Design a protein with these regions (language model features):
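Patatin-like phospholipase
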Residues: 1-91, 95, 99-101, 140-153, ...
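Short helix-terminating capping/connector loops at secondary-structure junctions
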Residues: 11-16, 113-120, 269-274
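Extended hydrophobic secondary-structure segments that form protein cores and membrane-embedded regions
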Residues: 18-24, 121-126, 277-281
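Glycine-rich, charged/polar anion/phosphate-binding loops
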Residues: 108-109, 190-195, 257-267
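Acidic, Ser/Thr-rich peripheral helices and adjacent loops at domain boundaries
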Residues: 220-259, 300-303
Length: 384
């Protein structure tokens, strides 16, 4: 999706997004955009290179020895009722992902982009297991953004790879991450206001990228031969329910508020303003795509999924949370690019970009914009 946007930008142009937010897998993408805010296209190319060459071993330990140790520990904890050993914190060890992010993410570069005026804020959402509430960790050029005043779920901090690991820690599958004495998990869990961080940080326009479409009504015929759901299918269903998509509801609420503001004859209350959204959601069934690439997964993971009954189409939901192989990610990149190119003119109009705009012209316009009356702050919001 972002690669199509980057293709519309001059090669050396800075990011068109002054405020970047992300949750779950979107947090990893958002941080990459923020770290390369000074040279947007270069950053997207680097990000795509990583995703196009992904393998499970770069995200979690999938070798037979690691899987066997985890299995034995689970078994021993179960048989001893936890007296001999505590069960593992999760099914998989996600430490390889931390190493990968440490190699590719330079938050000092992000802070330099803020100092140079290319970026206002980055916010990463994660879910607090103790309070069952979503928290937005943010870092801004302005230490105390005016719009964030009274924001109870916003925590100003110095962002790091640890925040990305917390936001992308899928429950049960990957371990919770400790931040400031609290444990956090995937930022998409019970997320009821995915657009709030960007709005709180001052955005007037929202470019929203999601990966989950609105629920579809499958054309299914009732039959007495429907098999009982497997453990893997149930877990996949539970995760899918836990990550229930609130993106469309948030956009619908935003559009209702916009209409009320436009129709109101009196000035809006302080802090209430019209916000223009553009939402891009790939029109694809990611579970079905994941099922086609299941054999690309490590043999040990495939064996685990088979024991859980998640190796067939019914278990494709769970499979989609664990599939990090290049054949799968390359197909997703291609789908996202096609969807974005189909709306190329709409995106270019929204961002105010032109394919023929020179890098020099872009820099002059940006400088003039910052030094005089600024255009509305454009935010990039990325969701799982």
């Amino acid at each position: 999706m972002l690669s199509a946007v980057a293709r519309q930008m001059p090669r050396e142009a800075p990011s068109p997004f002054q405020i970047v937010t992300g949750m779950s897998a979107g947090a990893i993408v958002a941080a990459a955009v923020a770290c390369h805010a000074a040279r947007f296209r270069e950053g997207v190319v680097a990000l795509e290179r990583v995703w196009r060459n992904f393998h499970s071993e770069q995200v979690f330990r999938a070798d037979a020895a690691s899987m066997l140790r985890a299995g034995l520990r689970w078994t021993l904890a179960l048989l001893s009722a936890g007296r001999l050993t505590a069960p593992p914190e999760s099914v998989f060890d996600s430490s390889p992902l931390g190493h990968l992010l440490e190699r590719h993410y330079d938050f000092k570069r992000m802070r330099q982009a803020m100092a140079d005026g290319h970026l206002e804020s980055l916010a990463i959402a994660a879910s607090n297991y103790r309070t069952a509430r979503s928290v937005a960790f943010y870092e801004s050029r302005d230490p105390e953004p005016a719009a964030a005043d009274g924001w109870q779920r916003g925590v100003g901090t110095q962002l790091s790879v640890t925040h990305l690991l917390a936001s992308s820690a899928v429950p049960f599958l990957f371990p919770a991450v400790r931040l400031d004495g609290e444990y956090y998990g995937d930022g998409a869990m019970r997320q009821i206001a995915p657009l709030s961080p960007a709005i709180r940080l001052g955005a007037d326009r929202l470019f929203v990228v999601g990966v989950r479409d609105q629920p579809k009504s499958p054309d299914m015929v009732a039959t007495d031969r429907v098999p009982a759901p497997s453990v893997g299918q149930v877990i996949g269903f539970m995760l899918d329910t836990l990550f229930i998509d609130s993106l469309h509801a948030g956009v619908a609420q935003l559009e209702r508020i916009n209409r009320l503001i436009e129709q109101s004859a009196v000035p809006s209350p302080e802090g209430l303003r019209r916000i223009e959204p553009l939402v891009i959601v790939p029109q694809a069934d990611f579970s079905a795509i994941a099922a086609r690439h299941a054999r690309a997964m490590p043999r040990s993971v495939r064996a685990l999924l088979r024991t859980m009954g998640a190796s067939n189409v019914g278990g494709s939901e769970l499979l989609s949370y664990l599939l990090f192989e290049s054949s799968y990610t390359r197909e997703l990149i291609a789908i996202g690019r096609e969807d974005a190119m189909a709306r190329r003119d709409e995106i270019a109009h929204f961002l105010g970009t032109s394919v023929r705009t020179s890098a020099a012209t872009t820099r002059v316009r940006r400088a003039a914009t910052i030094e005089s009356a600024p255009l509305p702050a454009t935010s990039l919001a990325l969701a799982r």
